[in-house]
Curated annotation (Swiss-Prot):
It is found in: Nucleus. GO terms for cellular component: cytosol; nucleoplasm. The record marks 169, 176, 180 as: Histone H3K4me3 and H3R8me2a binding. This is Spindlin-2A.
Length: 258
């Protein structure tokens, strides 16, 4: 996890041209193996931190310690040590074993479960979920960058936010999409339009993939190992995958068209 060179103001949604999202535009994906995790037994159950505000340090290799704050969105049922976290100023959702990853330092609970935010328009929320969309971001010099993607679900805890992924970058992001829709920066693509990679016909959905380990071969021939951790309800062929060497959550359609 690297600190972005410059984080945008909270809530501002901009992308550098061909870059990543707000706050993570300059963030490098670290492809390093996680350190051996501590396996000390616990004499009592851990406190449920889902919905809590947290802070912690982050130490990777010889790099300086950086400080992070965020909200714990969810605990992954198939791997209870893995949590999904929305960090302040970062648009990607991260998956971290907060209690076991040795790079996480001095984990603190800043507050008890935060009050769930409410959406302003439930009907509009239901309209955009599961849809292929075009999402406009402010690029360099005030230009507009168009990103095609799919709205996956309403985010847990932070209910005014939505999970979304993109053709250009198939990892899990979250934004306040209703505001973008009302401002004309989010457009639902017509059903007849060419669908993004995650938009597949519903037939042939594979059951029982949750918890399965997967292997991905990169262009250089090296392999990555990960686990399927979630199935998208509105698009059952689409799954979340957490790779062992990365804290991003990847979104893939695991059912090929015949």
């Amino acid at each position: 996890m690297k600190t972005p060179n410059a984080q945008e103001a909270e809530g501002q949604q901009t992308r550098a041209a061909a870059g990543r999202a707000t706050g993570s535009a300059n963030m490098t994906k670290k492809k390093v193996s996680q350190k051996k995790q501590r396996g000390r037994p616990s004499s009592q159950p851990r406190r449920n931190i889902v919905g809590c505000r947290i802070s912690h340090g982050w130490k990777e290799g010889d790099e300086p310690i950086t400080q992070w704050k965020g909200t714990v969105l969810d605990q992954v049922p198939i791997n209870p040590s893995l949590y999904l976290v929305k960090y302040d100023g970062i648009d990607c959702v991260y998956g971290l074993e907060l209690h076991r990853d040795e790079r996480v330092l001095s984990l603190k609970i800043l507050s008890d479960r935060v009050a769930s935010s409410h959406i302003s328009d439930a009907n509009l929320a239901n309209t955009i979920i599961g849809k292929a969309v075009e999402h406009m971001f402010e690029g360099e010099h005030g230009s507009k960058d168009e990103w095609r993607g799919m709205v996956l679900a309403q985010a847990p805890i932070m209910k005014a936010w939505f999970y979304i992924t993109y053709e250009k970058d198939p990892v899990l992001y979250m934004y306040q999409l209703l505001d973008d829709y009302k401002e004309g920066d989010l457009r639902i693509m017509p059903e007849s339009s060419e669908s993004p990679p995650t938009e597949r016909e519903p037939g042939g959905v594979v059951d029982g993939l949750i918890g399965k380990h997967v292997e991905y071969t990169k262009e250089d021939g090296s392999k990555r190992i990960g686990m399927v951790i979630h199935q998208v309800e509105t698009k059952p062929s689409v799954y979340f995958i957490k790779f062992d060497d990365d804290f991003h959550i990847y979104v893939y359609d695991l059912v090929k068209k015949s």
